[in-house]
Amino acid sequence: MEKSPLKIGILNVMHDKADTKTRLQHVLTHTAIPVDLHFYYPMTHYAGRTVPEAVSSILDPLDIHEVATMDGFIITGSPIETLEFDQVHYIAEVRTLLKTLSQHVPNQLYLCWGGMVALNYFFGISKLILPHKLFGVYPQTILEPHPLLKGLKNDFKSPHARYAEMDVRGIHADPRLTINATTTKGKLFMVTEPTDTQTFVFSHIEYDRWGLDSEYKREVAAHPEIDYVRAKHYYHHKNDYDHPKFNWKKTQRTIFDNWIQHVADHRNDNH
């Protein structure tokens, strides 16, 4: 008997929600394993105001009861990592989601800010503001092998874009947590816990070729008075910003394909 498609939910709290949805649709449907994707927004983010049509036309309000039936769930990044978690006005809804995921959903993937808020909620790890934004494409070092990294070798490339980092000393001090990979300069790439239910990835591995470039342009447009630095190790030639590299494509494909296979191997019995 043919199995039903994997049910995968995504809380999309990125600034570029339409592009993020398109990117995740692309990377999550690359394998031959059929998937049924459900994209959500946090309802309390729009409390007291009308949900913009650009959001409501592509995302559904977060439904906790529906979430509990998912085979896998992803929380995306969000450009709010400089805020304390309690300053995020929809944090209570996110924490309710995290509690539901921990109780009912066997496969959880947390990306960038999603990884930060989840690592803090589940393990009490603190978030620290970096002196400068980590922004560019960097080689990674594999410290501990993991099924999601299968097929990747040391120095695999991945894009990073964040103003904050989780407390590495706190992670090392918690025997439940493993740092599987970092940049070659020690910035976090992937953290896991022993049950392999939760994976925390601090890179925007879902970004397409233009993701970092678009992020730079968004920040410049929002704050033209700030002298933002362009992404490092990203453009083919200095002062030629029309031809960015996409040298993390194998990283992206490998990790998402491995995760989809992991979800298929550990389905939710609560459908």
UniProtKB/Swiss-Prot annotation:
Recorded catalytic activity of this chain's protein: L-serine + acetyl-CoA = O-acetyl-L-serine + CoA
GO annotation (BP), single: cysteine biosynthetic process from serine
Gene Ontology terms, MF aspect: serine O-acetyltransferase activity
Record key words, sorted: Acyltransferase, Amino-acid biosynthesis, Cysteine biosynthesis, Transferase
Pathway, per record: Amino-acid biosynthesis; L-cysteine biosynthesis; L-cysteine from L-serine: step 1/2
Job of this protein: Catalyzes the formation of O-acetylserine (OAS) from L-serine and acetyl-CoA. To a lesser extent, is also able to use succinyl-CoA and propionyl-CoA as acyl donors, but not butyryl-CoA. Does not acylate D-serine and L-homoserine.
Miscellaneous section: Is able to complement an E.coli cysE mutant strain but not an E.coli metA mutant.
Name listed for the protein in its UniProt record: Serine O-acetyltransferase
Species this chain originates from: Lacticaseibacillus casei (Lactobacillus casei)
Native organism taxonomy: Bacteria, Bacillati, Bacillota, Bacilli, Lactobacillales
